[in-house]
Design a protein with these regions (language model features):
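Extreme N-terminal starter segment of soluble prokaryotic enzymes
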Residues: 1-5
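Short polar catalytic/cofactor-binding loops
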Residues: 8-14
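Cys-nucleophile CN-hydrolase/nitrilase-fold catalytic domain and related Cys-dependent amidase chemistry
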Residues: 15, 23-105, 111, 177-193, ...
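CN hydrolase (nitrilase-like) catalytic-core segments centered on the catalytic cysteine
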Residues: 61-84, 145, 154-240
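Short beta-strand scaffold segments in enzyme catalytic cores
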Residues: 85-87, 98-101, 137, 220-222, ...
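Active-site catalytic loop in hydrolytic enzyme cores
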Residues: 90-169, 179-193, 255-260
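A short C-terminal boundary segment appended to hydrolase-like catalytic domains
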Residues: 251-274
């Protein structure tokens, strides 16, 4: 059994303050026997894509490894936990919406970059993010095989299926979901279906709190491979959501016993490219 913790915390205007709060949350969660800890999208900053990118955009970004990963790799090593972050990455003059995955020995196993980049009111992301160029990576961690679907990528069944085909047992979604952004129930329904169709656990960690241009709902949650919500955080609450996962459920799921085995990928190219 693996215990995960989704850190649903509000962000102030101080990155240092937010990182310190995150460190305290990880220590608390590790003290409560959590083995894997995940933050929301851009957890250590106010949600700057709420307004169009300006000339200061690059000052918001940092490298991987860099100052933020240095803090959390040391913490992962000390506490022997897996940590998934999310922030604006700078690499080769380009910026990405990135989630470094840090193993329990402090090693950075890799960094998932958001592939699909939206742009609509209060989510002016095309001005900040270059579309990810690394595909749907799955990481062998101390607790199991995990993938990351950053925010908007969760809407793409091709992306979620790619994680399943690569053997993901758990898919984490660092999310920035505004209050009342979606019709009631749809927020969870999408991830429940993804879990059921692909035979993995899904865990969505959402931002929370009022910011100058918008309010984030929280309501982080975890689904099992049967598509059932097994843990749910409160609306608007600053909290750590815990959930115990039994990865033996993955192999027993309908998706792993039936759906994936019966795929016919030779037919799909013509369908999706037409």
């Amino acid at each position: 059994m693996t215990k995960i913790a989704l850190i649903q915390q509000p962000a102030s205007g101080s990155r240092g303050e937010n990182i310190n709060k995150g460190v305290a949350a990880i220590r608390e969660a590790a003290g409560n026997s959590a083995n894997l800890l995940c933050f929301s999208e851009l957890a250590f900053d106010r949600f700057f894509p709420a307004q169009p990118a300006g000339p200061d955009r690059d000052t918001l970004a940092e490298t991987i490894p860099g100052p933020t990963t240095d803090v959390f790799t040391a913490l992962a090593r000390e506490l022997e936990v897996v940590i998934v972050l999310n922030f604006l990455e700078m690499d080769g003059g380009k910026t990405f919406d990135s989630s470094p995955v840090i193993d329990a020995d402090g090693a950075i196993l890799g960094s998932t970059r958001m592939v699909h980049v939206p742009d609509y009111p209060c989510f002016h992301e095309k001005g900040y993010y270059t579309p990810g160029d690394r595909g749907a990576a799955v990481y062998d961690t101390a607790i199991g095989r995990i993938g990351v679907a950053i925010c908007y990528d969760r809407h793409y069944p091709e992306y979620m299926r790619a994680l399943a085909v690569a053997g993901a047992e758990l898919v984490l979604t660092p999310q920035a979901g505004a209050a009342d952004e979606w019709p009631d129930g749809l927020f969870e329904a999408e991830m429940r279906v993804a879990a059921f169709q692909n035979g993995f656990f899904t865990a969505l960690c959402n931002r929370v709190g009022k910011e100058p241009r918008m309010e984030f709902a929280g309501e982080s949650f975890v689904c099992n491979p049967a598509g059932v919500v097994i843990a749910r955080a409160g609306r608007g609450s600053d909290e750590i959501l815990y959930s115990d996962l039994d990865f033996s459920e993955v192999a027993l799921s309908h998706a792993r016993k039936l759906f994936l085995a019966d795929r016919r990928p030779a037919l799909y190219r013509d369908w999706i490219e037409s």
